[in-house]
């Protein structure tokens, strides 16, 4: 399995403030890594490092300069007074050929949105259009920054199903970022919990047979969603300092 991006003990400091400390991770073709963490954990900074938009203060990043990356941003801010159809929005990407737009939208089941105004789309529809735009360069790595933000549970299940299909079709690596600390995509190969440093990592615990989970999401939801249980040996105080836990759960 080929390695697309490798981060080795990277740290990022802005002035006297350390944003990321000693982060190591590997993104591989055909595998999904979900990055979890609360607001302010450094997730967006880490994404910028992976995308090559920010150089780490220390540590090393190994990435093929020709690596094709498809990026779906966390938020899309559009002027509500600006007439902009999905077709025109897709063409704003440099080098896009008009004949490639409809096939990309079809891949994400959004061909019917081609001439719809971007400002009128629902959260789930917007995410599908952004995914289609990210596919235009045949990516080897998909970076999805909170792709289910503003999308209801049914929409989340549909998006997760779609992301898995795209992973299989393109055999691309996927880095997915989320602030939901307990609900992640069941097809995730690895979960990495971040709070300035790597708090914990591992595979998600699939709870597809749990009666409460099935009652909430049904069998289809159980196939697409999973709960990840965190096992930390520490917590963070209000200043972000690490407080180690003793055995039995008390702080050291």
Curated annotation (Swiss-Prot):
Catalytic activity: Zn(2+)(out) + ATP(in) + H2O(in) = Zn(2+)(in) + ADP(in) + phosphate(in) + H(+)(in)
Gene Ontology molecular-function annotations: ABC-type zinc transporter activity; ATP binding; ATP hydrolysis activity
Transmembrane segments: none
Lipid biosynthesis is among the record's keywords: no
Cellular localisation: Cell inner membrane
Keyword Translocase: yes
Record membrane topology: Peripheral membrane protein
Primary location group: membrane
Domain of life according to the entry: Bacteria
PROSITE patterns in alphabetical order: ABC_TRANSPORTER_2, ZNUC
Family listed: Belongs to the ABC transporter superfamily. Zinc importer (TC 3.A.1.15.5) family.
PANTHER family (alphabetical): METAL TRANSPORT SYSTEM ATP-BINDING PROTEIN TM_0124-RELATED (PTHR42734), ZINC IMPORT ATP-BINDING PROTEIN ZNUC (PTHR42734:SF9)
Subunit-level organization: The complex is composed of two ATP-binding proteins (ZnuC), two transmembrane proteins (ZnuB) and a solute-binding protein (ZnuA).
Protein name in UniProt: Zinc import ATP-binding protein ZnuC
């Amino acid at each position: 399995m080929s390695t697309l991006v490798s981060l080795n003990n990277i740290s990022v400091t802005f002035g006297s403030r350390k944003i990321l400390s000693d982060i190591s991770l590997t993104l591989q073709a055909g595998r999904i890594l979900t990055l979890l963490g609360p607001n302010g954990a450094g997730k967006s900074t880490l994404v910028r490092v992976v995308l090559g938009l920010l150089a780490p203060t220390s540590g090393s990043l190994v990435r093929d300069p020709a690596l094709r990356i498809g990026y779906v941003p966390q938020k899309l801010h559009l002027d509500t007074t600006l007439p902009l159809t999905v077709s025109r929005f897709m063409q704003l990407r440099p080098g896009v050929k008009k004949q490639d737009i409809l096939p990309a939208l079809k891949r994400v089941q959004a061909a019917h949105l081609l001439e719809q105004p971007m400002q009128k789309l629902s959260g789930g529809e917007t995410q599908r259009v952004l995914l289609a735009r990210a596919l235009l360069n045949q990516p080897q790595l998909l970076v999805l920054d909170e792709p289910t933000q503003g999308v209801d549970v049914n929409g989340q299940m549909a998006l997760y199903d779609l992301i898995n299909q795209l992973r299989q079709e393109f055999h691309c690596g996927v880095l997915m970022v989320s602030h939901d600390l307990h609900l992640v995509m069941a097809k995730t190969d690895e979960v990495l919990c971040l709070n300035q440093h790597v708090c914990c990592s591992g595979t998600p615990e699939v709870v597809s047979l749990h009666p409460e989970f099935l009652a909430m999401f049904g069998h289809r939801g159980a196939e697409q969603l999973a709960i990840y249980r965190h096992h930390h040996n520490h917590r963070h105080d209000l200043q972000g300092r690490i407080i180690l836990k003793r055995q039995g759960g008390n702080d050291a």
